[in-house]
Amino acid sequence: MSNLDKERAYGGGRPVPGYSLDVNGRKVCDGQIEEYIMELIEGEAFGYGYYKIYKLLRRKHHLIINPKKVYRLCKKLNILKPQRQIKVKYPRRIARNREITASNQLWEVDVKYGYISGEDRFFYLLSYLDVFDRNIIDYHIGLYCSGQDAVFTLGNALKRRNINNPKETGLIIRSDNGPQFISHVFEEYCNTVGIEHERIPVNTPNKNAHIEAFHRILEDDCLSISEFETYAEAYTAIVEYMYYYNNVRIHSSIEYLPLMEYYLGVLAG
């Protein structure tokens, strides 16, 4: 077992995220709904109040949701119309095409949701992926995922890669517009340590293609074939899969080698 896995410890219960159904009866985690809301705010709904956002959620994402819940989620995200900031302290940087030639130049980060059928609730998996060597550098599993969790996990990822001065190495973090990544605490941390944080435009998941591909593999290899009874069971399964993904599974994009073997080979020259 790697050091990454030895350091994991089951953290017990945390606040439970809820969900809403869509018109097909599929359960949509509140975290995903929050992402939908933030994408709307970044686009056509910038000047809308919560009731128009509620209407868009029903029309665009086919959610069965009531206005009170949309109000509550908007209030939690600090984006009710009176709460919205006119001037952003950390201006948004739009993701652009880059030529990546080495590890630790560009990391992608995103959140994936998993369902625990035995407890009828969702858990969160936040992961940082190196675009060059494709390793999952570090990750967070929890029943909740905040901007502070994203910061803590990023700090651990920097330590794992022995990056003491991100500004000197020119590290770029690329994310979508999820609430964790537009939070003040995340933007402030990136600014303080010298990381350039860029965000993909709304409805362009191809700009975060590598971590989206990882999420599809995770879904196919693990989540879609598992029915978790407890959070502890889901937690253990994800930790085991992450070890497998980095250290055992071969990848066609890197000469059919395991990711960690490829990364260590690059380090050795």
Question: Language-model segments: what does each one mean?
Answer:
Residues 191-195, 216-269:
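C-terminal domain-tail junction helix/linker
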